[in-house]
Design a protein with these regions (language model features):
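Short flexible coil/turn linkers enriched for glycine and charged/polar residues
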Residues: 147-150, 160-161, 257, 267, ...
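Proteins enriched for Cys/Gly/acidic motifs involved in redox and nucleic-acid/cofactor modification
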Residues: 1-208, 222, 246, 261, ...
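Contiguous mid-protein beta-loop-alpha structural module that forms a pocket-lining wall or clamp
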Residues: 312, 327-329
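Conserved SAM/AdoMet-binding glycine-rich loop
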Residues: 81-82, 90-91, 95, 193-315
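Terminal RNA-binding accessory module
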Residues: 347-444
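Hydrophobic, well-ordered secondary-structure elements that form the walls
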Residues: 263, 304, 324, 332, ...
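Alpha-helix N-cap/loop-to-helix initiation residues
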Residues: 22, 58-61, 88, 240, ...
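Short glycine-rich, low-complexity segments
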Residues: 330, 343-347
Length: 444
């Protein structure tokens, strides 16, 4: 039984590390606490409750989590501190001993933050922790964040059964699981009722959707496409072996699914892909990109790449660079390999020095910018429909075209959360966006 009177006049602050899924889950936690009467603290206000949603994909992410705990404890003396997320799952007992931490919640308890706030009495002798082994977790914690009420993030799947050699996510998130399509359609309908226009479909391995319910990712896409009021959907990230021709073909003819794919490659040589235990080779990946381009020539295609994994010699990196350079893609998300305890990758010979990882990373980041700018340049002078978002104070108003080109224009309150037809001009000062040369009118 929750005593809601304890939360009267209380304020909370939230700190999130990691992926879009984590941000979605934090927003859901925040929403639940607000419904219980806990206000989100404004900038500079002292909070009574601190919620940290952690990440464990790299050593740096874990370090940032510990730094965030120390900073929030220092800035909010006496606040009740809760840590959840992937790092909390993997190192619950360790985190419970961090100065100021009251409760650490593993993945199975992530949806129960409110229940674990108790009477907000701090623990003087160290924090409590609740985390069962990820392999035993079967529950699915729903999440649909509304953010700025323009773009929603809908969690459709959790966990992963792939066990790539470099990755701790299966140990932090558990086995692949999902709710029924009908439940997710209901959440999309709620987002539409609140005025949402765009939904980003998120998860850990969303193409694996359906294992828990006997459904499929394609059936989910088809059902969501029929939700009235949602003008746009984006597929956040999908494994190359799970993005079937049927999915690509459906998106190509879809009412609301945008020509935008994010497909993780992770390594550009067959030798390293094999060391990683990925489920495809470079030939398969290239064919998949070509198929997307054939059916959706204007699609924005983002690709994840990890540099400096064990076993990636300089020769293999050069081979990977040339392969990636030849792909007709729009942008790269580049990550430096981080050694994670308990992973099979630690058994592989050929560790890459940090300086060499950095060099390789910078080469691919530069290649990514070349590809993104070249993609943007194709659309200068053309008309496009942009969904504009609420601007930050003093900043231009920004939004995205259907194929994920960032567009900026002077602030105009009437255009916020509206689909607006514009004529695309040249680049802004730092080339991060195109300027809307002309506002043609609303496209809805």
């Amino acid at each position: 039984m929750i005593d809601y009177t304890v939360f009267k006049d209380k304020k909370a602050v939230y700190y999130t590390l990691g992926c879009k899924l984590n941000f979605s889950e934090t927003a859901t936690i925040e929403r639940r606490l607000q419904e219980a009467g806990i206000r989100t603290a404004k900038r500079g206000e002292k909070a009574d409750i601190c919620i940290i949603n952690s990440c464990a994909v790299t050593q740096e992410a874990e370090k940032k989590c510990r730094q965030a705990i120390h900073k929030l404890v220092r800035q909010n003396p006496g606040a009740y501190v809760v840590v959840t997320g992937c790092y909390a799952q993997l190192s619950a007992e360790k985190l419970s001993r961090e100065l100021g931490v009251d409760v650490v919640l593993g993945i199975d308890k992530k949806g129960e933050v409110l229940e674990h706030l108790g009477n907000l009495v701090k623990h003087s002798d160290g924090g409590e922790w609740y985390a069962q082994p990820a392999k035993d977790v079967r529950n699915f914690v729903h999440s649909c964040s509304r953010g700025d009420r323009t773009r929603y993030f809908l969690k459709v799947q959790d966990g992963c059964d792939y066990f790539c050699t470099y990755c701790t996510i299966p140990f932090a998130r558990g086995r692949s699981r999902n709710p029924h399509v009908s439940e997710l359609v209901a959440q999309a309908q709620m987002a539409a009722a609140e005025g949402g226009k765009e939904i980003v479909i998120t998860g850990v391995n969303i193409g694996d959707f359906g294992k828990s319910t006997g459904e499929s990712f394609l059936s989910l896409v088809q059902a969501l496409d029929g939700v009235e009021g949602i003008s746009r959907y984006r597929i956040s990230s999908i494994e190359p072996n799970l993005i079937t021709d049927e999915i690509i073909e459906y998106v190509a003819g879809s009412r609301a699914f945008m020509p935008h794919f994010h497909i993780p490659l992770q390594a550009g040589s067959d030798e390293v892909l094999k060391l990683m235990h990925r489920r495809y080779d470079t030939s398969f990946f290239a064919q998949k990109i070509a198929r997307v381009r054939e059916l959706l020539p204007d699609a924005f295609i983002g690709v994840d790449v990890i540099v400096g994994t064990r076993g990636e010699s300089e020769e293999l990196f050069d081979k990977a660079y040339e392969f990636i350079k030849g792909l007709d893609i729009s942008q790269l998300h580049v990550f430096s390999y981080s050694e994670r305890p308990g992973t099979q990758a630690l058994k592989i010979d050929g560790a890459v020095p940090p300086a060499e990882k950095h060099r390789r990373s910078q080469l691919l980041i530069a290649l990514s910018e070349e590809k993104r700018i070249a993609f943007y340049e194709r659309y200068i002078g053309k008309e496009a429909v942009v969904l504009f978002e609420k601007p930050r104070s003093g900043m231009p108003m920004g939004g995205f075209t259907s194929n994920y080109i960032r567009v900026e224009t002077p602030q105009n309150a009437e255009s916020v959360n509206r689909l607006v037809r514009v004529r695309l001009g040249g680049f802004n000062e730092d080339k991060s966006a195109l300027i809307a040369d002309e506002i043609i009118g609303f496209a809805e």
